A protein has these predicted regions:
Chain B
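Final/C-terminal transmembrane alpha-helix of multipass membrane proteins
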Residues: 234, 240-257
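Hydrophobic positions within alpha-helical transmembrane segments of bacterial inner-membrane proteins
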Residues: 68, 72, 110, 114-115, ...
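Membrane-interfacial helix-loop-helix connectors in multipass membrane proteins
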Residues: 77-100, 165-210, 214, 218-240, ...
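Hydrophobic alpha-helical transmembrane segments of multi-pass membrane transport proteins
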Residues: 91-134, 219
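Active-site cofactor/substrate anionic-group-binding motifs, chiefly glycine-
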Residues: 51-107
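Short, membrane-interfacial amphipathic segments enriched in basic
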Residues: 2-46, 223-228
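Short cytoplasmic-facing helical segments at TM-TM junctions of multi-pass membrane proteins
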Residues: 124-149, 231-234
Length: 249, 263
């Protein structure tokens, strides 16, 4: 469903992606792991068309993302949970969740959009009481849940999760991991997650790809990850300071 | 002699010039894109109403107070200056022309630059830093249509009204000072003011307001969208937006004054 071939991206003289090749099948949950600054977020943003790759081809459902005719329809396939939530501060929680349903091609009547928002909030474990609060009034964990509710509000085919557990305590991280897994299975959505939290990887993924040096260093089913012989992968999953990955970056 | 001694300063000058021209080009492209998005759907009416409130209505107190004190001070200055050649009687006329043609629009423009440009730039820059702009795009919403167009349109429409109100309050400030402490007759002061002002004075004032409103809100949006990372990026964007808006407003004021009143 999502294909990346030989994707390159540089910012000024800094080369971030140096030929990324990746395939994600429909309904698959892929987790991209890798150290900070290895280009995980850039990869996701290239698929969404937020950043244009310098070279290479990215296809979603066989359609080149740089040549989508109807951008609105293309983006309607996606839901995204941002690292910091990226909730809109100036509008209440329910309008954040129902943002896509209040405007554009998926516009619904306001009362219906609110009902859907409350249902999605309930799905991520939040009570309807939070619907009228502003995002700044919520804790970090609740903001992540609202972000998750917004990502699934329009029942997207593809969901991206950018560091879904960063900044959360271990229990809340576990709750978010379980929610992501349940929701992805329940919706039958294709999921791409980027993280360096190995607990998330084991909880969320069907397949794992490790990004290092601007390329996919290793990829395979999560069940084969621990037995993978790649020294970079082993150093990453064991969190060892000794190994081929430079610790000073 | 080392040829670098001559070429190095030229290279520095060249780089600075190219950088400035590139910046100007980006700003012009941004302004043209804003105008294009203003006339093509979709339009976000709720955001526009909210911008009308923030840019227009909530700026009334600062505009009113600025105009009132300026009008009063202007009356005192003209009276004491005019006394040097026995021309104290021209206070109503000079206050009127000074407020309507120059001080009203310029001071309102600068106050809007301080209040609105800064807040728009800080808000949009923070949205950029916290990935809210990226989130807008993933939610099929064009950031220029959702953030820039409502604010710039609100600036274009409400700042002329603010200038009109500022002109009236400024004249009132001058009237109050003149009648309470300078011994002018209230009715004849007002009569002189109304008789002296011509339609072109008011028209130029409102036209300046529209241009200054466009500049002030556009600069806030432009620098907000161009913001760098982190708190430093937001601070730099806010500072640059206010400086650019103030300078452009003063430059535009000169050009508009020349266009309206050059003989």
């Amino acid at each position: 469903m999502i294909e990346l071939s030989n994707v390159h991206k540089s910012f000024g003289s800094k080369q971030i992606l140096r030929g990324v090749d990746l395939n994600v099948a429909r309904g698959e949950s892929l987790v991209i792991i890798g150290g900070s600054g290895t280009g995980k977020s850039v990869t996701l943003k290239c698929v969404l068309g937020l950043i244009m790759p310098d070279q290479g081809v990215i296809k979603v459902d066989g359609e080149d993302v740089t040549q989508t005719g109807d951008r609105d329809a293309f983006l309607a396939k996606f839901g995204m949970l941002f690292q910091g939530g990226a909730l809109f501060d100036s509008i209440p929680v329910w309008q954040n969740v129902a943002f896509r349903l209040l405007r554009g091609t998926l516009k619904r009547p306001r009362s219906e959009a609110r009902e859907i928002a409350i249902e999605k909030l309930r799905r991520v474990g939040l009570s309807p009481d939070v619907a009228d609060q502003l995002p700044a009034e919520l804790s970090g964990g609740m903001q992540k849940r609202v972000g998750l509710a917004r990502a699934i509000a329009a029942d997207p085919e593809i969901i991206f999760f950018d560091e879904p557990t960063t900044g959360l305590d271990p229990i809340m991280a576990g709750v978010i991991n379980d929610l992501i897994r349940e929701i992805v299975v329940e919706m039958g959505a294709t999921a791409m997650t980027i993280t360096h939290d190995m607990t998330s990887v084991r909880a969320i993924s069907d397949t794992v790809a490790m990004l290092h040096g601007g390329k996919i260093r290793w990829s395979g089913p999560v069940t084969e990850m621990d037995s993978g012989e790649d020294p970079y992968l082993q150093q990453f999953i064991t969190g060892s300071a000794d190994g081929p990955i430079e610790t000073l970056r | 002699m080392n040829p670098g001694v001559i070429t190095r300063p030229l290279a520095v000058l060249g780089r600075a010039s190219l950088g400035a021209l590139a910046g100007l080009g980006r700003l012009v492209i941004f302004a043209l894109a804003t105008v294009r998005h203003m006339v093509t759907p979709p339009f976000y009416s709720r955001e526009f109403m909210s911008a009308l409130l923030n840019v227009g209505y909530l700026s009334l107190p600062v505009v009113g107070l600025t105009a009132f004190f300026t009008g009063g001070a202007l009356a005192l200055q003209i009276y004491s200056g005019g006394a040097r050649f026995s021309a104290e009687a021209v206070v109503p006329q000079i206050v009127a022309i000074g407020m309507v043609r120059e001080l009203g629009p310029v001071l309102v423009g600068l106050m809007i630059a301080a209040r609105v440009t800064a807040s728009v730039a800080a808000e949009i820059a923070t949205m950029k830093v916290t990935e809210q702009i990226d989130a807008l795009v993933t939610l099929s919403t064009h950031p220029m249509k959702y953030l820039t167009v409502p604010r710039v349109l609100a600036g274009l429409l409400t700042v002329p009204l603010l200038v009109g109100i500022g002109d009236i309050i400024g004249i009132y400030g001058g009237w109050l000072v003149s009648t309470q402490s300078l011994g002018f007759n209230p009715a004849s002061y007002m009569q002189n003011t109304v008789n002296f002002l011509q339609p072109i004075d008011v028209l130029s004032s409102l036209a300046k307001g529209a241009v200054f409103g466009f500049i002030a809100t556009l600069m806030g949006c432009y620098y907000g969208m161009q913001s760098g990372r982190g708190a430093q990026g937001v601070g730099a964007a806010t500072k640059s937006s206010v400086v650019a808006a103030a300078i452009l407003i003063l430059a535009a004021n000169f050009l508009l004054t020349q266009a309206f009143f050059s003989i």
